[in-house]
């Protein structure tokens, strides 16, 4: 499987960042001001995003672009895009071969979302201050090309890969998947195959090199026959396993599948693993749908009791890929729950929240699911704040001049759609002043459902070491036979 986790999430994050950057350009007026997000030289007339006559270079101010990329609405779109794409990645990894698959999925999605929050910091320090991109132009009009997305992929690709490579969660998941795949592998490793070939062919090869072709006359043809035998065994014997794909829309709902049901719908299998084992033990079963939840168009899940399983004895050759590449609408993120109280939080259940404010100290905490603990993030207090005379509160409404409060009081504003930042306001004599810097908020939090719909497909896994060994034996046998023939004396060739 190699580095498929890192490669897939890098590709998704880079493309999402590139699309967002391109969208920002499409909504930005082009000017000659080099401090703007995008600027062009020699602009005649009004500048609008239209026309497509000839190509001109435009300068991208990366600092201005990064500032635009960290706005709440852009960050929310990036988060939702990556969370949606993460479902396809998860589905392709056959995650249900791992114990605690739900936790692994949740960790993966969480790391993917956090990647959005860190990319801007990583890329800001690693990309150049300015970049030139191609645009198309008609007289005084300028049109941003479709290939700006591709150009931004080139710009952001390296720094996104670095951000992914340094993320321990992605690397840990990859190690678990690799370990699981290795533990199920049947046969020799490639190094063992190489050693076996060396042992089998070592003597005749040495004999040819030494000028003695007698052994080679027999051993190399035998090598060809042995290689052919390995290929026959490789093609005729296979280990049958199940490939499970999460967040499925089901075989029955995928037009490309053309599935034929194998008997009635069952309501006796409690989970997808049981369905997979049942299909695996049935020679007529080639695929299954296991439904444990009903997912509506908004991505809300409602548990289906009892779960339903449908087995199939026939599906199309493209069915598995069609199901894997088109996951359902399950939402994997949600708005966090905010709570406040006097004193530090004690547990997840007390209070039942994701973010907590201690009104006695202005300390704020995020709940960390992997450790099941509250983690202090910082404090909102300014130097003059005192618990004895001042108060603190938070919410989704920006304070105004008419908002009541005692001088020194604190109000923390966070976005109602995506609380990715905390804006700290302090009451003065006649207004509320915004303090800097802006603090990092929780953003959207992961919400992987406990029950996930799954489709599984029977897969025949062949012993690849037999293929490697067979090909190696045939190649060495052919070349060895030629070598042995050429080493014979002229009178022996007749």
Curated annotation (Swiss-Prot):
The keyword Metal-binding does not apply. InterPro entries: Virion_mem_poxvirus_L1. GO terms for cellular component: membrane. It is found in: Membrane. Keywords: Lipoprotein, Membrane, Myristate, Transmembrane, Transmembrane helix. It comes from the Viruses. The chain crosses the membrane at residues 193-213, 214-234, 465-485. Its main location: membrane. It is a multi-pass membrane protein. Pfam families: L1R_F9L. A lipid is attached at residue 2 (N-myristoyl glycine). Belongs to the IIV-6 118L/458R family. This is Putative myristoylated protein 006R. It comes from Invertebrate iridescent virus 3 (IIV-3).
């Amino acid at each position: 499987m190699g580095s498929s986790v890192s490669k897939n999430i890098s590709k998704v994050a880079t493309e999402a960042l590139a699309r967002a950057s391109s969208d920002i350009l499409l909504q930005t007026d082009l000017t000659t001001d080099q401090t703007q997000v995008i600027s062009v030289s020699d602009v005649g007339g009004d500048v609008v995003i239209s026309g497509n006559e000839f190509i001109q270079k435009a300068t991208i101010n990366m600092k201005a672009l990064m500032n635009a990329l960290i706005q709440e609405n852009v960050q929310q779109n990036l988060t939702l895009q990556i969370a949606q794409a993460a479902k396809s990645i998860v589905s392709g990894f056959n995650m249900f071969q791992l114990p605690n698959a739900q936790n692994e999925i949740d960790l993966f999605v969480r790391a993917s979302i956090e990647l959005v929050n860190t990319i801007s910091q990583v890329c800001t320090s690693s990309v150049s201050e300015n970049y030139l991109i191609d645009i198309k132009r008609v007289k005084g009009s300028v049109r941003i090309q479709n290939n700006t997305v591709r150009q931004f992929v080139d710009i952001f690709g390296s720094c996104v890969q670095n951000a992914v490579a340094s993320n321990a969660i992605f690397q840990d998941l990859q190690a678990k998947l690799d370990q699981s795949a290795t533990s199920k592998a049947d046969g020799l490793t490639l190094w063992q195959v190489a050693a076996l070939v060396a042992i089998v062919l070592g003597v005749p090869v040495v004999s040819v090199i030494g000028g003695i072709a007698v052994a080679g006359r027999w051993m190399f043809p035998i090598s060809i026959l042995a290689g052919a035998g390995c290929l026959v065994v490789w093609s005729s014997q296979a280990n049958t396993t199940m490939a499970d794909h999460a967040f499925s829309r089901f075989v029955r709902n995928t037009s490309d599948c053309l599935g034929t049901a194998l008997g009635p719908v069952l309501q006796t299998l409690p989970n997808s693993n049981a369905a997979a084992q049942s299909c695996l033990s049935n020679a007529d079963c080639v695929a299954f749908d296991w439904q444990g939840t009903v997912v509506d168009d908004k991505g809300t899940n409602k548990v289906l009791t009892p779960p339903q399983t449908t087995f199939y004895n026939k599906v199309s050759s493209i069915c598995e890929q069609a199901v894997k590449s088109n996951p359902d609408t399950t939402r994997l993120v949600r708005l966090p729950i905010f709570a406040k109280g006097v004193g530090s939080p004690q547990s997840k259940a007390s209070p039942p929240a994701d973010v907590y404010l201690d009104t006695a100290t202005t300390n704020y905490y995020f709940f960390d699911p992997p450790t099941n603990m509250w983690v202090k993030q910082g404090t909102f207090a300014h130097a003059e704040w005192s618990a004895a005379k001042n108060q603190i509160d938070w919410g989704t409404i920006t304070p105004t001049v008419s908002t009541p409060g005692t001088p020194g009081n604190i109000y923390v504003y966070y976005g109602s759609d995506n609380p990715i930042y905390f804006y700290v306001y302090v009451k003065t004599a006649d207004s509320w002043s915004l303090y800097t810097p802006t603090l990092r908020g929780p953003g959207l939090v992961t919400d992987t459902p406990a029950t996930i719909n799954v489709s599984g497909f029977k897969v025949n896994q062949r012993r690849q070491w037999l293929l490697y060994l067979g090909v190696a034996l045939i190649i060495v046998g052919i070349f060895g036979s030629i070598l042995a023939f050429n080493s014979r004396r002229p009178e022996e060739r007749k």
